[in-house]
């Protein structure tokens, strides 16, 4: 089943019922995704990034795709170690993969992202 998508059962049910969702992922998709992850975690690549570029990491701490927050934290830590000066990490307790589709939390998360973006625009 696809319970990993959302803590909200109605979101999971909607996903299952939607004929446009749930297509099988191809080997090529996984290959490209894993290549991107490895590329983005190589310190030599991270050190080439603009150190003043703000980066926001948001995820649910129960998202198995991000190893329940561990993978996101590792990426955040790697960015910081590479000298990125403005990295922010926000893990939402109890939430899974589709944090912006969590009906009970979407407004709060959207507001958090908006607040973060606006604060960077003011600099």
How should these model regions be labeled?
Residues 64-74:
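Conserved alpha/beta-hydrolase "acid-adjacent" motif
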Residues 1-58:
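Alpha/beta-hydrolase
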Residues 58, 72-73, 89:
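Structured catalytic core of nucleotide-sugar glycosyltransferases
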Residues 57-65:
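Conserved strand-to-loop "acid loop" that flanks and positions the catalytic carboxylate
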